[in-house]
Every structure is written in C-alpha cells, then in structure tokens.
C-alpha cells in the first residue's frame, strides 16, 4: 500500500440535517461504534455490523438517535471504557446530556443544566486519576465549559442518582472554547487544560480528588503586559497519549506544543504554522 492510498472504498453515513461538528469512536471493546454530533441538535450512534470488519462494506447501521437537545450539539466525548458505553454531549442549549447503554439493550439519559448561554466542550476524567486508594469505587467525573467563562466539574452521585456539580473554575474572562483532561499514564496528579476566547490557556492541577485545583497559565506572549495572551482565540487543546505534551490550536493558524519542565513551568517546545492556500 502506498502512502495516502485508501484502505477501502469508504462509506458516507447520511442522516444529519446540518453541519456535523464532531465524530468520536467508542472503545473497541464495545464493537465498531461511532458517534456523530451536529448543528441540527442531534447525536447519532452508528455501528458497523459487517461480518468481515470492513468499514466500507455497507454494514453500518444507526442504532441510536439522540434528539433531546434544542440547539446545536457542539461536542461529544466517550467516557473511559471502565465506566461502560457512556457518551457525554455538550449543546448550545446550555445542557449536557449523558447517554448510557444498559445491559438490557436500552439507553438511559441524564440531563444537566450546565452553562447558561451554551456549552462548548466536555471531557472525562481518566478513571485511574480519580481513585484514592486500592479497592475504592471508581469515580465518574467530567468537565464542561461554555459561554459563561466557567469550567465546571461534575461527578455522578450514587446517593442522588444523578450528576452533581462539585467545582467551578473561574479564571477565564470570556467564552471557554475547549477543555481536556490529560491521560493518566505515569502522572502523579490530575491535569486539565482549558482554552478560551480570552486568548489564554490555563493548566489546572489537582493532587487528589478532594484537593483544590491549582491554576498555571501558559506564557506565549513576548511583552510583559501580554505574557499570558496568545495572538488570537484559542480553539482547541489536546494532550499527547502520555499526557506530558499539550498541543494548542490558535486562531492565527499556529499550533504550538508545550511541556512542563522540572521546575513546574510550561515551555513551548515546538510551533507549527499552518500553510495558507
């Protein structure tokens, strides 16, 4: 196979009535399952049921239509597979819905009124970073971000049988565009990155699940009065698989990579300028 050559014919999954903002694969232990989120306010869950495993064989079926939102669904994220087949959906209607596939084949839905004015992003905390001691029950936590400039942390409460807000992170001054928990491989604490319309990226750390969050801004600016400011809106943040390098995507067409040094400071180790056609 030559570089860039298609593996198969491919297949177009049709059904949404507006732009599709995001797609997300479920963990392979649940099968070949793909979720899609759209401006039409719907989330579709698709499953490839072909016997030979080919993605382009016409074996895709839409197994769930999630249409409870009244505005665009902007982001989706599957929970850690240890928590089951669970999908969080963030919408411009201000709500976050959590879809869970049950053992009897049914789907259950939890709705959370998260952010007045709209929710832009959602991210699940890795399971291993939320366990305080061996044998302790797995904590089910996620972070959401939206138009209120606030990042909220939620936890599923067995006592109340619903998701409850346990923390608010309030350092941003404008819409929070993205939020991302770092993978927990080899990390001593929990890391959470947030990106905002205010042109800043903040790194939040928590030593244990009950400790307060500590905030450290990235420092991309050359001028002392603008040290925390990127050149434009920061749209996305994404962690490396090992969780020690953060990619930052900015509105000026640049992607920068950041890494924490031994002193606990974050340094830009690389920068890529996207070509303009």
Where are these regions (language model features)?
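Loop/turn segments within WD40 beta-propeller blades
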Residues: 24-31, 77-84, 123-139, 180-189, ...
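WD40/WD-repeat beta-propeller blade N-cap
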Residues: 13-20, 66-73, 112-119, 125-126, ...
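Solenoidal tandem-repeat scaffolds enriched in leucines and small polar residues
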Residues: 56-157
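Conserved strand-to-loop turn within each blade of WD40 beta-propeller repeats
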Residues: 36-40, 48, 89-93, 101, ...
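WD40/WD-repeat beta-propeller blade-loop signature
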Residues: 9, 19, 30-33, 62, ...
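Terminal intrinsically disordered, low-complexity extensions flanking WD-repeat/beta-propeller proteins
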Residues: 130, 177, 183, 187-190, ...
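Beta-propeller domains
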Residues: 1-12, 50-51
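WD40-repeat beta-propellers
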Residues: 1-2, 23, 43-48, 76, ...
